[in-house]
Amino acid sequence: MPLPIVAIVGQPNVGKSTLFNRIINERVAIVEDRPGVTRDRNYARASWMGHQFSIIDTGGITWEDSTIDEEIRAQAEIAIEEADVIVMLADASQGVTSLDERIAHLLYRADKPVLLAVNKADNPEQRTDIYDFYSLGLGDPIPVSGSHGTGIGDLLDEVVKNFSPDAEKTEEGVISFSVIGRPNVGKSSIVNRLLGEERVIVANEEGTTRDAIDTPFVKDGTKFRVVDTAGIRRRGKVYEKTEKYSVMRAMSAMERSDVAILVLDASTGIREQDKHVAGYAHEAGLGMIIAVNKWDLPKKDSSSGKDFEAVIREEFSYLDYAPIVFVSAKTGKNIDQLPKMVKEVYENKNQRIQSSVLNDLLLEASRLVPAPMVKGKRLRVYYMTQVKTNPPTFVVFCNDPELMHFSYQRFLINQLRENFDFTGTPIKILPRKRK
């Protein structure tokens, strides 16, 4: 099961981003920031009272005619579709506005839990004024102050009450993967070809809140679940072509995935949108496979394949761990290799290395390349241990974490890759001061 998703929506300038940031700072723990549309820092994974969830901050909803306003509204509507719980934020100092009423009517149609939070209720008089917001028909208004932090705990208590009891459970023994990429690269065709070639189709399951089709199947005795981002219903060609729309669709799929297959179009080459989606998947810590589709076209031979692979390695240098496979959804070329590759990446991503073996490697690495001097002070590395899998994460204890330059972390990652099979998975190094 995917993590529950909470969307914060409302008109402009009611304090949505302030509330979002306050939740991140005030809750018990932030699991990790999620990039993507996230250069705007509007997507994070969080927890409250033991409940993990993803939270989305959206732009202010208006019904102006400008292209920017239309795109912002489209993004908010996508977030509403994705969400399990919606928080509508209003402004106590403004009172109930016509925009609030229009947004409330939009949320009536969502057919999912909606909580009404009234921001800037900073004093008793403003808290009394919130009763006007009952007119929106969204239940009891919850007074909050994003700037001061009051009422945030009460709001989050109500949020987690609305999570499905099964929302945070995971299905054992099933490898979930998503097929991601910009529009029209052949994602849906690859999924259809993949499923059409399987001997056993277990069942089709439609996501109850997301309109994305998760399809379980069995291949060579292994249970898989493919998340087809193309199954999310479209909102029209103008939004289908926007970069953020594509990333939002990919984000939803990645929340339900162990591994992502990034599909590139051999006929059009690499676009900026490809890099945006790939960057999100990489920073989210997913296992990665790069599938170059439409390799059935003329003039696609082994020589041009090597050339294209070189371009991929240059453009996606941060994905140097991801295997590349040339496929054709039209002819079926190499499609049957994808489940096998997904399984291998999943296993690599979840392997655990004994500390004694790691420290032997660390000792040998120190002999090969002595720890560097930084500002006249030498880095001293003492020992390494693996603290988690999925993705593999290693803590390296040293005399001063600030002395461990990125280049030395990269060296240690390369040593790990040379000695163990981490194909397809990112590796994280966390320097820590030895106590």
UniProtKB/Swiss-Prot annotation:
Binding, GTP 2: 181-188, 228-232, 293-296
Q: Which family does it belong to?
A: Belongs to the TRAFAC class TrmE-Era-EngA-EngB-Septin-like GTPase superfamily. EngA (Der) GTPase family.
Q: Under which name does UniProt file this protein?
A: GTPase Der
Keywords, alphabetical: GTP-binding, Nucleotide-binding, Repeat, Ribosome biogenesis
Q: Where is the KH-like domain?
A: 351-435
> Tell me, what does this protein do in biology?
GTPase that plays an essential role in the late steps of ribosome biogenesis.
Q: Which Pfam families match?
A: KH_dom-like (PF14714), MMR_HSR1 (PF01926)
- Residue ranges annotated as transmembrane are none
In what residue span(s) does the EngA-type G domain sit?
4-167, 175-350
